[in-house]
Amino acid sequence: MATVGVLLLCLCLCLFAPRLCSSKEEGPLAARTVLAVAVTMEGALRAEAATGGRSSTGDVQRLAVYASLETDSRLRVRITDADHPRWEVPQDIIPRPAPGDVLHDAPPASSAPLQGRVLSPAGSDLVLTVHASPFRFTVSRRSTGDTLFDTAPGLVFRDKYLEVTSALPAGRASLYGLGEHTKSSFRLRHNDSFTLWNADIGASYVDVNLYGSHPFYMDVRAPGTAHGVLLLSSNGMDVLYGGSYVTYKVIGGVLDFYFFAGPNPLAVVDQYTQLIARPAPMPYWSFGFHQCRYGYLNVSDLERVVARYAKARIPLEVMWTDIDYMDGFKDFTLDRVNFTAAELRPFVDRLHRNAQKYVLILDPGIRVDPIDATYGTFVRGMQQDIFLKRNGTNFVGNVWPGDVYFPDFMHPAAAEFWAREISLFRRTIPVDGLWIDMNEISNFYNPEPMNALDDPPYRINNDGTGRPINNKTVRPLAVHYGGVTEYEEHNLFGLLEARATGRGVLRDTGRRPFVLSRSTFVGSGRYTAYWTGDNAATWGDLRYSINTMLSFGLFGMPMIGADICGFNGNTTEELCGRWIQLGAFYPFSRDHSAIFTVRRELYLWPSVAASGRKALGLRYQLLPYFYTLMYEAHMTGAPIARPLFFSYPHDVATYGVDRQFLLGRGVLVSPVLEPGPTTVDAYFPAGRWYRLYDYSLAVATRTGKHVRLPAPADTVNVHLTGGTILPLQQSALTTSRARRTAFHLLVALAEDGTASGYLFLDDGDSPEYGRRSDWSMVRFNYKIPNNKGAIKVKSEVVHNSYAQSRTLVISKVVLMGHRSPAAPKKLTVHVNSAEVEASSSAGTRYQNAGGLGGVAHIGGLSLVVGEEFELKVAMSY
């Protein structure tokens, strides 16, 4: 039966993806046998697998297999050539435990095949079984016996082509990840292929490889367990998902698999980001609203935009400028007519006086201009010899400024060069963050006649059509420092540039850096935020933005958003209005548009301005919550924006939900994603759900429920789940002003009468985020036995250095979902046993919602955030 299963897998591969079965590199699968197995003193497993004889297909004869349980929840299986070193992601780029030595002096194979060996340390839920003849391996879950990864016999390992297939349980596996692609579904569809090769392709194109490569997926299986799988490789690849199998086809490197036990989605991302690096902490101001456009005319144009946002009373935190500001599109220069230092510097200074920020774009290509010794960046780059090479000379590309050289960020001096250029430029224009674009790397030159690296034996499905991998990028034969070819390093460039940029900003400012990168790889979240690239002003792109946002949360990149109102093409008033209602709840919220398209600043249409004020007004109230979620992301990898199954993994109905999302565990966003409707269909998992705009109980369900909600043109549905305590502040036009307002606590009761939450506070831009810096953590708890008796809200100050030295107060507590037969005649309020005024003039009142639960507003409070308190509310009838 095993042989039949393998034949069926191969048949499915050819039926559903014939292109993947036509490569000249593919041929008879090599049967391998384990020749030797050893267990190291550290408990790792080492083995050698070899083919039965000389292969006519170029298979590597001897493979070294290394397997180790690196933590109780993380298993590594690495397969490489036993006799020759091969490219793999360098340790200094993604620090990780080094594998053990390979077996070079294994004993010859015996006539009787070795039995399968098992790696199953006590305390771990992961079990590895290595099968001897033919060689294959299986990863299973000890607690359930469920098989997580089961490779088919016939692993292929050639110099430029590696292939391995794993069976999956048909009907039970739900896969997410394997990016970056614009997909119409967050859950991966059966019989689909996923190409990973960083490319300058517009995000408006569906089902093609885009700017980043993340060979990681999460598998959520009924009834609610989850695990993760990473193939750590920077080489180009196709991954084919057929529902009952997943096949990797990689054009180089090694097979370096990591398996993460979970057993729930939050645990998987915790384990994954523990390996690849935790997400970078973002400055508080970056959670404000951002405005950008490719095509701003001059500094006066920027000034008008800022002034009109203020006049319209729409929050604006950060003003951005695209490549328009440059002199001939050259990095670290200013246009000599429209964006002179004499005009731009005072504009930036005025932004700063108003507690607003300024961000500029950089592209990696440095203009080749040897006759112009005044372009200092080029001159210094040549002096330090840090550019990418070809045949011993600098590789010439072509982008916006014309011919360019690209910094080689694998060169040990390149990061220092980049940091110095940032510092020199900031002396003229003190930008607050940097946006790095075109770093796939994008290259406008048409491919030259191809060689073996341009067109390897297996052609991945680049651009959805199998284009050569040199299309619109640096040629794979270009050489990085140390002799590494672009063929191997290609997918790492954006990560390396983000690392150099972030470190440069940190060194120059001493503050927490904000970097936004278009190209990403495994671990990029350690250095950069991300946006979904060049989307289009269409309703489809509005919908797809949720899928990409949720996928990047899995990849350890929680600070993500899409260009609000769409980048390419002309938007419409209705689309822009609905987009800001969604975009106000992206972790990264920015309006951006392309040159020669209609402008789309939010104030241009009265209806969009109204939607913006309402949605962004709520976002700014939620800033303490967003920032607390950023702290959670930095400490545990938990996404800010999450799919519903993160909180409800046992509810199978949530597995396919991708038109709604959660912020943290408590806030549910259900936007309108089509033109015309004034209602939206939403799914509510089991529990109580309260409207965040008016605090009323909207849905109470024990099993999960689909509900049609009213969604008038100026409103997005946002709900708070029962059991949550949510700290809010008041809305303002900047985050700085919002931070100076008093806190409110929303206490949304669960069915059992409990609720909890927490608040993280610091100065908003200290580099030592939540560790050695000045910070505070406060936990809030609520419990009322059987929904009867006095109400008690308690705070617990876990860490207090920040709040203790500042006057931060909670002026109001709102209790939502209190069951009461009638409105109480009187509310008596005690704080730490002392009675306080509870009059209507102080803002205390009770809103009776009948059987759906009442809302008690307790106002006039001065609860000090940095001091523990107990708030007790008694109701007299």
From Swiss-Prot:
According to the UniProt entry, where is the signal peptide? Answer: 1-23
Q: Which domain of life is it from?
A: Eukaryota
Where are the annotated segments for Disordered? Answer: 89-115
Q: What is its EC number?
A: 3.2.1.20
Sugar attachment sites are: 191, 298, 338, 391, 471, 570
Q: Which residues form the active site?
A: 437, 440, 534 (proton donor)
Q: What induces it?
A: By gibberellin A3 (GA).
Matching entries from PROSITE patterns are given as: GLYCOSYL_HYDROL_F31_1 (PS00129), GLYCOSYL_HYDROL_F31_2 (PS00707)
Question: PANTHER family, alphabetically?
Answer: ALPHA-GLUCOSIDASE (PTHR22762), P-TYPE DOMAIN-CONTAINING PROTEIN (PTHR22762:SF133)
Q: What is this protein called?
A: Alpha-glucosidase
Name the species this protein comes from: Hordeum vulgare (Barley)
